[in-house]
């Protein structure tokens, strides 16, 4: 099969991440993304490497027997959701199967390696579950009207105005519509990624699930030719605050970003209304969140994730960490560190993002926790500098997993138990191979679905020292 070949096939399975395996009438297998098991699809081969062909999806010729009617009018055009036409229980089955395959390919099956795979916990909410969205300004086609939403599937430039997005609640949709209407009427140009000209870049919206508090951050360039920015922003603030919301508006902000890269970047933020932060609650703790704070985007799902992790850590003995020191490596804003603090002597969190460390310290103080210590720095370097030795280690690394040298240092501590929380099962499978080759074994595994209708999945693993 050569590059440029156009063919059809039936998708027999989908591997992580979002890689459909389509089988042609001749028995050839082609990887086609954004597909669902059982679909008959047309594809064009765009890559052939080591006798392995990858194709771009051109058309779904026949729907899968698994599929139902899509609840979102943007599905198929928007690049946000992939499994929205699949019933939720089947989505969970697909994700569980994908993770099980990756783990068993890496370290053996449950029977071969002796671990227990508990299954998968679903999200408490299947729709309207997100507490944060980053919308982009642009157009839906070249020289078309202003758009505000998500990138079209497979497109770097074109957008879909997701005014009826189903993974956020009505307040998000109201804010999007109010913003788009206002700037469209004022003929304000968006920042063009090719010419690097224009004003409007992104709209960042956050809403706490538990408290209902909302903040909005408009991200623009400093290119203000042709209009009075102060008057424009005052009008924007008015356009937002005069709409009806179920939640409580806590702040409207304006962030400047002249970076060429198409990412939300903070080069200076001003408050147009209210505060620059809001509060969310998680498992009885309170967290102060700014527009750029890292915080799990599904608050109710995060409670399931962290409660499951806490059960893995403590087991049947709720006093097992009394008088002990816990390392929380890649600790982010210190959520899990603060959840463990009441049951241990001390928690030491290590995180490379300095702003996240500042937030962790502030939130620990907010929750009255004086036995949390947070250190800003690379885990690989900080482990050489910490004097306290851990009795237990919690690992919650970024998507790429743990640096091999850092794994070596972690193993040298020789702790009896560790819990690994992973947001990318391919990285997890690779890292588990290293742990198992260095005197540890996998005791049990559980998946948690934090992102319904997408291919993303979280996995929690209890790792134990052999003969412990």
What annotation goes with each model-predicted range?
Residues 59-70, 79-190, 210:
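Extended interfacial segments that mediate partner engagement and assembly in macromolecular machines
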Residues 118-126, 193, 200-202, 447-450:
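Short, solvent-exposed loop/turn elements at beta->coil junctions and helix N-caps
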Residues 206-208:
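Structural signature of eukaryotic scaffold interfaces centered on beta-propeller domains
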Residues 1-74, 111, 153, 373, ...:
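Terminal RNA-binding accessory module
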Residues 20-25, 149-152, 217-219, 360:
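Short, acidic/hydrophobic/Gly-rich beta-strand patch recurrent on exposed beta strands
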Residues 157-201, 222-254:
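Internal alpha/beta scaffold segment
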Residues 38, 168, 298:
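Short, conserved phosphate/pyrophosphate- and ester-handling motifs at nucleotide-, phospho-/glycolipid
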Residues 1-7, 13-17, 222-468:
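Rossmann-like S-adenosyl-L-methionine
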């Amino acid at each position: 099969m050569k590059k440029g070949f156009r063919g059809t096939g039936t998708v027999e399975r989908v591997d992580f991440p979002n890689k459909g395996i389509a089988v042609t009438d001749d028995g050839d297998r082609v990887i086609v993304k954004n597909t669902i098991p059982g679909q008959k699809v047309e594809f064009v081969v765009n890559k052939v490497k080591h006798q392995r062909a990858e194709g771009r999806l051109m058309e779904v010729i026949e729907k899968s027997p698994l599929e139902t009617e899509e609840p979102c009018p943007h599905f198929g055009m928007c690049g946000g959701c992939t499994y929205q036409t699949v019933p939720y229980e089947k989505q969970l089955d697909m994700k569980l199967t994908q993770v099980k395959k990756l783990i068993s390919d890496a370290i053996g099956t449950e029977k071969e390696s002796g671990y227990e795979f508990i299954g998968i916990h679903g999200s408490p909410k299947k729709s309207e579950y997100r507490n944060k969205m980053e919308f982009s300004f642009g157009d839906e086609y070249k020289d078309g009207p202003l758009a505000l939403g998500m990138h079209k599937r497979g497109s770097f430039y074109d957008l879909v105005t997701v005014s009826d997005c189903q993974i956020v609640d009505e307040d998000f949709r109201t804010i999007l519509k109010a913003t788009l209407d206002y700037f469209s009427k004022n003929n304000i140009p968006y920042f063009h990624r090719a010419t690097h000209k224009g004003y409007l870049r992104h709209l960042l919206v956050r809403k706490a699930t538990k408290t209902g508090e909302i903040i909005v951050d408009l991200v623009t360039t400093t290119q203000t030719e042709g209009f009075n920015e102060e008057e424009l922003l005052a009008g924007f603030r008015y356009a937002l605050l005069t709409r009806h919301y179920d939640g409580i508006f806590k702040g409207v902000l304006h962030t400047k970003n002249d970076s060429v890269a198409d990412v939300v970047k903070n080069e200076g933020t001003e408050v147009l209304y209210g505060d620059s932060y809001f509060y969310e609650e998680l498992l009885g703790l309170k967290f102060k969140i700014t527009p750029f704070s890292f915080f799990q985007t599904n608050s109710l799902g995060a409670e399931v994730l962290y409660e499951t992790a806490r059960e893995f850590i403590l087991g049947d003995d709720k006093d097992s960490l009394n008088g002990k020191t816990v390392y929380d490596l890649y600790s982010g804003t210190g959520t899990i560190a603060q959840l463990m603090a009441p049951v241990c002597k001390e928690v030491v969190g290590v995180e490379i993002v300095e702003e996240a460390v500042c937030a962790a310290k502030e939130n620990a103080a907010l929750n009255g926790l004086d036995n949390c210590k947070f250190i800003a720095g690379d885990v690989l370097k900080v482990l050489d500098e910490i004097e306290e030795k851990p009795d237990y280690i919690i690992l919650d690394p970024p998507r790429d997993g743990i640096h091999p040298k850092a794994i070596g240092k972690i193993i040298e501590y020789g702790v009896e138990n560790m819990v690994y929380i992973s947001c990318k099962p391919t990285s997890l499978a690779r890292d588990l191979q290293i742990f198992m080759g260095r005197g540890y074994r996998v005791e049990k595994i559980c998946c948690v679905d934090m992102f319904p209708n997408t291919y993303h999945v979280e996995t929690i693993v209890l790792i134990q020292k052999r003969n412990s």
